[in-house]
């Protein structure tokens, strides 16, 4: 016993292996520095002669896994105490077995967290691989070409010609690559659920294409009607739309018209309010051209008969001026006028009748003599005979 006590008195005190609380790491650094400077000071929470090597190792582990701090077990100062806080009559430091078990628990929790992280990454990779596998099944399905065609048909509706050409070329290129790379799918490896999905999706795309096509066709028909109406009004063909091949419909136009329209904008001529009447007239002329031409000729002949030659009219006007007081030619004078003018008796009679109605008004003496002649036919006869005897002024008989 004396030798054992002597050894204890000469041997320095051993270090306590108890762990400090995780939340007090900064405090541990300060206390470890103090213990290195003064090994005989017993005021430290970790006991005399505490070395800061363990504390530095724990601090390094926390720096490596900062996101795992919430998963580590929380300890308190009441769970782990230093040797000088416990009653010890012999003043010898006591070693507790909780240190080794706490170290094992710490590493087990850390490894469990790492394992959970790896499992989450593996699950994400599995999800990505599942999506890629499903895509490969859809592409290798026999109905995929039908599905692709229905989808591209929907994209072509209302698209410009260059876009339609690019879509068609892309589809042909894709089908060529699929025929070279995709193996044939056996009947045993087919998925009934995938087959049902492909059929339903193809039907949905076909119906969607029909719904898109209907308003486009109605709009095209409306524009064609507008074109025809504008063409009828303007007497020239007007084309609002272009052919599917991108060329203009106005193939028969001259080079000057094509150069004028090369700007891309269609200039509409001014609308004539009488264009509709002219269109109707042209239509009737085409339908009744023979009858109208004969009728026109007949009407022109009648007009020519009603209009006397200029020389004949001049001779009749000369006789009219000489006999203005009483412009009634006798039968002999009518014959003479007919021979000189080349007209017939009917034309001469009609000309004098119209001329007297329009340009002659008898004087009051003439009106009185005419009225008196109605009462005395003998005087009227003398007047008429004396009037036509010469071209000079005449007297009335008794």
UniProtKB/Swiss-Prot annotation:
GO terms for cellular component: nucleus. Residues 300-363 bind DNA. It holds the Pfam family KNOX1. It is found in: Nucleus. One of its GO terms (molecular function) is DNA-binding transcription factor activity. Residues 20-61, 78-102, 241-273 are annotated as: Disordered. It comes from the Eukaryota. Induction: Negatively regulated by ASYMMETRIC LEAVES1 (AS1) and ASYMMETRIC LEAVES2 (AS2). May play a role in meristem function, and may be involved in maintaining cells in an undifferentiated, meristematic state, and its expression disappears at the same time the shoot apex undergoes the transition from vegetative to reproductive development. Positive regulator of LATERAL ORGAN BOUNDARIES (LOB). Probably binds to the DNA sequence 5'-TGAC-3'. Able to traffic from the L1 to the L2/L3 layers of the meristem, presumably through plasmodesmata. May form heterodimeric complex with the TALE/BELL proteins BEL1, BLH2, BLH8/PNF and BLH9/PNY. Interacts with OFP1, OFP2, OFP4, OFP6 and OFP12. Interacts with CCT7 and CCT8. Interacts with KNATM-B. Binds to AGO10/PNH. Interacts with BZIP30. This is Homeobox protein knotted-1-like 1. The lineage of its organism: Eukaryota, Viridiplantae, Streptophyta, Embryophyta, Tracheophyta.
């Amino acid at each position: 016993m004396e030798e054992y006590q002597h050894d204890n008195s000469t041997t320095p005190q051993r270090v306590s292996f108890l762990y400090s609380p995780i939340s007090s790491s900064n405090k541990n650094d300060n206390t470890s520095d103090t213990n290195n400077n003064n090994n005989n000071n017993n005021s430290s929470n970790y006991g005399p002669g505490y070395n800061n090597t363990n504390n530095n190792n724990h601090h390094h582990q926390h720096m490596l896994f900062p996101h795992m701090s919430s998963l580590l077990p929380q300890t308190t100062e009441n769970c782990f105490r230093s040797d000088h806080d416990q009653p010890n009559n012999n003043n010898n430091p006591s070693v507790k077995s909780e240190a080794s078990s706490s170290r094992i628990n710490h590493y087990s929790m850390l490894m469990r967290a790492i394992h959970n992280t790896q499992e989450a990454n593996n699950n994400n990779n599995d999800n990505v691989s599942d999506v890629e596998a499903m895509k490969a099944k859809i592409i290798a399905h026999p109905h995929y070409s039908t599905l692709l065609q229905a989808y591209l048909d929907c994209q072509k509706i209302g698209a410009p010609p260059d876009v339609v050409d690019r879509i068609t070329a892309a589809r042909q290129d894709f089908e060529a690559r699929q025929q070279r790379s995709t193996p044939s799918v056996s009947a045993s490896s087919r998925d009934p659920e995938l087959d049902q999905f492909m059929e339903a999706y193809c039907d949905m795309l076909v119906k969607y294409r029909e719904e898109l096509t209907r308003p486009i066709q109605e709009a095209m028909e409306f524009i064609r009607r507008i074109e025809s109406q504008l063409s009828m009004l303007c007497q020239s063909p007007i084309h609002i739309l272009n052919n599917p091949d991108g060329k203009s419909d106005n193939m028969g136009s001259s080079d000057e018209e094509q150069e004028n329209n090369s700007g891309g904008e269609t200039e509409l001529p001014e609308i004539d309010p009488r264009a509709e009447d002219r269109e109707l007239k042209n239509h009737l002329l085409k339908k009744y051209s023979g009858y109208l031409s004969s009728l026109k000729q007949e009407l022109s002949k009648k007009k020519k008969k009603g209009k006397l030659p200029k020389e004949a009219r001049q001779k009749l006007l000369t006789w009219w001026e000489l006999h203005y007081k009483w412009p009634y030619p006798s039968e002999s004078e009518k014959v003479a006028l007919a021979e000189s003018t080349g007209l017939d008796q009917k034309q001469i009679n009609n000309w004098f009748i119209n001329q007297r109605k329009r340009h002659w008004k008898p004087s009051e003496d003439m009106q009185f003599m005419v009225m008196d002649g109605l009462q005395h036919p003998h005087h009227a006869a003398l007047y008429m005979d004396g009037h036509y005897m010469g071209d000079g002024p005449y007297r009335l008989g008794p």
